Amino acid sequence: MSVFALGLNHTTAPVDLRGRFAFTLEQLAPTLQGFRERLTTGQRPGTPEAAILSTCNRTELYCAAEPQLVRPALEWLAGVGGVGADTLSHHAYMLEGGEAARHAFRVASGLDSMVLGEPQILGQMKQAVREADAAGTLGSTLHQLFQRSFAVAKEVRTATEIGTHSISMAAAAVRLAAQLFEDLREIRVLFVGAGEMIELAATHFSARAPARMAVANRTLERGERLASRFGAESIRLSDLPQRLHEFDAVVSCTASSLPLIGLGAVERALKVRRHRPIFMVDLAVPRDIEPEVARLDDVYLYTVDDLSAIVQSGGEKRLAAVAQAEAIIETGVQSFVHWLGQRGTVPLIQALNAQADSWRENELVRARKLLARGESVDAVLDALSRGLTQKMLHGTLAELHASDPAQRAQLATTVSRLFLRGAIPPDAVRPSGPREDDHLDGV
């Protein structure tokens, strides 16, 4: 069994393509179960383990499965997003084994985020694991991968200053607004949604004391709770088109599968505003604001991808923290690869133990019969020990005897390492073929 990660993120795919592969929490369990059903049909081997991490910046499918399932997994994901497999391949990354583990560790630690070191991704990954566990698709191999990811992320955040020298998406939005408006204390800000990202954006804007703030959310009660924290007004999402003109800045981030703010609504708002500019930030994937809105002369619309240049600033201290974090991650990768390799030998170890137990049981049955016939204990013990020795060595000696000269030296080295701890007797391996007196003593 192998571990692989298939995904696309803000560095490999545009926001519109990422939106095709965005999943809500409610969609994860049925999607994972559908994936497992699809890949366990026909002649495909094994039952794959799977988990999906879906955020505004990435969608990633983590699997523990046989290597030949990689291509079917890609085709399945492409079908879910309604694109061709070749199109997805062009924008996706496929990582296997140690590379997949390294990627998971970097994601959990915030090194692969648009905002370096951002803490939200760790919580999102933990939620993805809980959803996979509830769906029954997690499995012991992925469980180990993610638990090690969380441990590495904790060490990175404890031992380095990762994230200290970066700014958040919300802070970047405030910076952009400050470039457009002379005084943020005079603007009116509308937040659409009531999730973690909107809460963070409201915190940053509130620190600049805008003239007025409002929260529009589909669930009015949740919107009211957030609004009360910042002394803001709570409005119904259904009232948004009629009230859009009241606001100079709009920040939106919801889980809607369709845009909430359309071109027509913005055009009407601009007309009422006599074309005073509107600053808009769409942090949602899929988009909350129709992309055509960006064509309007008096609208300054920014998406998560547009904010990337701002949040990538950092300096030398940030580079030093990254180097420290990468070293911690590399140690974790080597440990996981070693564990995964050991896990691959488990079936062999189980088979060896079963074979040894079978030999032991057979010899015990034989010994008991000899004792019942009145044989001496010493004779029975001698026969039992010889029987076990012959069974243990027969297969190995037979392979040595049957091997050709080219194979014999390598096989002899392996046998020596396993049975003699590397001490090969002189003349144990000869370059020539078998001599006439070669035989299997005692077999």
From Swiss-Prot:
Record's catalysed reaction(s): (S)-4-amino-5-oxopentanoate + tRNA(Glu) + NADP(+) = L-glutamyl-tRNA(Glu) + NADPH + H(+)
A molecular-function term among this protein's GO annotations: NADP binding
Pfam families: GlutR_dimer (PF00745), GlutR_N (PF05201), Shikimate_DH (PF01488)
Positions of NADP(+) binding: 193-198
EC class of the enzyme, as a word: oxidoreductase
Record carries keyword Ribosomal protein: no
Gene3D superfamilies tied to this protein: Glutamyl-tRNA reductase, N-terminal domain, NAD(P)-binding Rossmann-like Domain
InterPro entries on file: 4pyrrol_synth_GluRdtase (IPR000343), 4pyrrol_synth_GluRdtase_dimer (IPR015896), 4pyrrol_synth_GluRdtase_N (IPR015895), GluRdtase_CS (IPR018214), GluRdtase_dimer_dom_sf (IPR036453), GluRdtase_N_sf (IPR036343), NAD(P)-bd_dom_sf (IPR036291), Shikm_DH/Glu-tRNA_Rdtase (IPR006151)
Keyword set, alphabetical order: Chlorophyll biosynthesis, NADP, Oxidoreductase, Porphyrin biosynthesis
GO process terms (BP): chlorophyll biosynthetic process; protoporphyrinogen IX biosynthetic process from glutamate
Catalytic site positions: 56
Pathway(s): Porphyrin-containing compound metabolism; protoporphyrin-IX biosynthesis; 5-aminolevulinate from L-glutamyl-tRNA(Glu): step 1/2; Porphyrin-containing compound metabolism; chlorophyll biosynthesis
Record-marked site positions (Important for activity): 103
Residues reported in the UniProt entry to bind substrate: 55-58, 113, 118-120, 124
EC number: 1.2.1.70
More info: During catalysis, the active site Cys acts as a nucleophile attacking the alpha-carbonyl group of tRNA-bound glutamate with the formation of a thioester intermediate between enzyme and glutamate, and the concomitant release of tRNA(Glu). The thioester intermediate is finally reduced by direct hydride transfer from NADPH, to form the product GSA.
Subunit structure: Homodimer.
Family: Belongs to the glutamyl-tRNA reductase family.
Notes concerning its domains: Possesses an unusual extended V-shaped dimeric structure with each monomer consisting of three distinct domains arranged along a curved 'spinal' alpha-helix. The N-terminal catalytic domain specifically recognizes the glutamate moiety of the substrate. The second domain is the NADPH-binding domain, and the third C-terminal domain is responsible for dimerization.
Purpose of the protein: Catalyzes the NADPH-dependent reduction of glutamyl-tRNA(Glu) to glutamate 1-semialdehyde (GSA).
Protein name in UniProt: Glutamyl-tRNA reductase
Lineage: Bacteria, Pseudomonadati, Pseudomonadota, Betaproteobacteria, Burkholderiales
